[in-house]
Swiss-Prot record:
Keywords: ATP synthesis, ATP-binding, Cell inner membrane, Cell membrane, CF(1), Hydrogen ion transport, Ion transport, Membrane, Nucleotide-binding, Translocase, Transport. It comes from Brachyspira hyodysenteriae (strain ATCC 49526 / WA1). It is found in: Cell inner membrane. This is ATP synthase subunit alpha. Disulfide bonds: none annotated.
Length: 499
């Protein structure tokens, strides 16, 4: 075979002539300072706010502060492998978390990585953690109840599907217990639950997971945990990650979802720490100026979607921890103004044995009343006012002034009502049974029963109804109404005569 040099040269010239360089320039930055979950970087002139960046160590971060010369980034996860001089590159995307049915029953960190030791989570579905809240046209009125199984809440401060109801109180007043009761009570209702633990001890989170497992609630629940041992950036993004997981079920599967943020005080503290480390100007209580937006953009994502979007819902129960019952502090007042009502737990009530320790006077539900069933409205209509007047009369009676018979009778009925509304932890009561019990109390059937026998009366009444009058309970549950008030009165009267 005879190959001529001129032919080779001609082929090479043709190839060179037609060659087009195809390359993508890649911006690279350098870490100049790192510590406490924060990295300061030079370079990356075109990086966007909240864009993901990749460190040489394999850690992922978010571009948080965009300054003239440097970028302030938060590191998501372990920042100990990042050193001064480490290379950083852009990922050109915003933070996403895995979502879907595969996460149900699992414990994950805010990035969706499993931390329960039960293997990898296999899902190809992902959602961005920062998603716009639905607009007015995409929502509909809250009109369907979300039963918590707690008598005091379902009767006086009812929660509707799509509502945001704040649980607020001092440390150790039973805030988490109320949230867990609400999750346990969703068994069999088709509601998907997400529990977001922010800044709690790992042992506390393990206890919560164990409680949910014991009550068969873990199978429809996702636990998102950013524990006290995790860095401030992870605690900051935890609620948004949990919300994205809940939104998948609301938007894609058209389901009702319930999310617990336990608690947003610790998230605000983590955000304050990040902001101060990044030299953002401090405001009231050293929080940055946009701390209101931190919570408003999260809680506005809770909604009851319009029928055109499938009619799914996201109900949010944020928890706020107060110091010495100080409800007028900065973060509590912010979240109170964002939410649709609050359940206020009082230390003095908790210590005196009233559990759940709900202060009826200051607790309110602004939209849940529209979602309350007709049956509960009929029996619990005056309950809040009666209990509030009982509290004021009780304070007045401490003075030792002689009281008339009517006032004494009101005090006696109020004390029995308070006793009736006490409830054991993790023992939610079905809605129809709550209706019967509260009906009996408001109609005066407890008047000649001693206070220490109120719970015995309640227990025996429910046993009697389940055994002999189950059809009445079924009717109330299906119709959400009491059609024959006189008939129910006679049934309880008949039971009372044998008690």
């Amino acid at each position: 075979m005879n190959i001529k040099a001129s032919e080779i040269a001609a082929v090479l010239k043709e190839e060179i002539k037609n060659y087009k360089a195809d390359f993508t320039p890649n911006e690279v930055g350098v870490v100049v300072e790192v510590g406490d979950g924060i990295a300061r970087i030079i370079g990356l002139p075109h990086v966007m706010a909240n864009e993901m960046i990749l460190f040489e160590s394999g850690a992922v971060g978010l571009a948080f502060n965009l300054e003239e010369e440097t970028i302030g980034a938060i590191v998501l996860g372990d920042y100990y492998g990042i050193k001064e001089g480490s290379k950083v590159s852009r990922l050109k995307r915003i933070l996403e978390v895995p979502v879907g049915d595969a996460l149900l029953g699992r414990v994950v960190n805010p990035l969706g990585v499993p931390i329960d030791g039960h293997g990898e989570i296999t899902t190809d579905k992902r959602r961005v953690i920062e998603f716009p809240a639905p607009g007015i046209a995409d929502r509909q009125a809250v009109k369907q109840p979300l039963q918590t199984g707690i008598k005091a809440i379902d009767s006086m401060t009812p929660i509707g599907r799509g509502q945001r109801q704040l649980i607020i109180g001092d440390r150790g007043t039973g805030k988490t217990s109320i949230a867990l009761d609400a999750i346990i009570n969703q068994k069999g209702t088709g509601v998907i639950c997400i529990y977001v633990a922010i800044g709690q001890k790992a042992s506390t989170v393990a206890g919560v997971v164990d409680t949910l497992r014991q009550h068969g609630a873990l199978e429809y629940t996702i636990v998102v945990a950013a524990t006290a041992a995790d860095s401030a950036p992870l605690q900051y993004i935890a609620p948004y990650g949990g919300c994205a997981m809940a939104e998948y079920f609301m938007y894609e599967q058209k389901k009702d979802t319930l999310i617990i943020y336990d608690d947003l005080t610790k998230q605000a503290n983590a955000y304050r720490q990040i902001s101060l480390l990044l030299r953002r100007p401090p405001g009231r209580e050293a929080f940055p100026g946009d701390v209101f937006y931190l919570h408003s953009r999260l809680l506005e994502r809770a909604a009851k979607l319009s029928d055109e979007l499938g009619g799914g819902s996201l109900t949010a129960l944020p928890i706020i921890e107060t110091q010495d019952n100080e409800v007028s502090a900065y973060i509590p007042t912010n979240v109170i103004s964002i939410t649709d009502g609050q359940i206020y737990l009082l230390t003095s009530l908790f210590m005196s044995g009233v559990r759940p320790a709900i202060d009826v006077g200051i607790s309110v539900s602004r939209v849940g009343g529209n979602a309350q069933t007709k049956a509960m409205k009929k029996v619990a209509g005056t309950l809040r006012l009666d209990l509030a007047s009982y509290r004021s009369l009780e304070a007045f009676s401490q003075l030792g002034i002689g009281l008339d018979k009517a006032t004494l009778a009101q005090l006696d009925r109020g004390a029995k009502m308070v006793e009736l509304l006490k409830q054991k932890q993790y023992s939610p009561i079905p809605f129809e049974e709550q209706v019967v019990v509260i009906f009996a109390a408001t109609k005066g059937f407890l008047d000649n029963i001693e206070v220490d026998r109120v719970h015995e009366f309640e227990w025996r009444l429910l046993q009697y109804m389940r055994a002999d009058k189950q059809n009445i309970l079924d009717d109330i549950r299906e119709k959400k109404d009491i059609e024959d008030m006189d008939g129910l009165y006679k049934i309880i009267e008949e039971f009372k005569s044998k008690f």
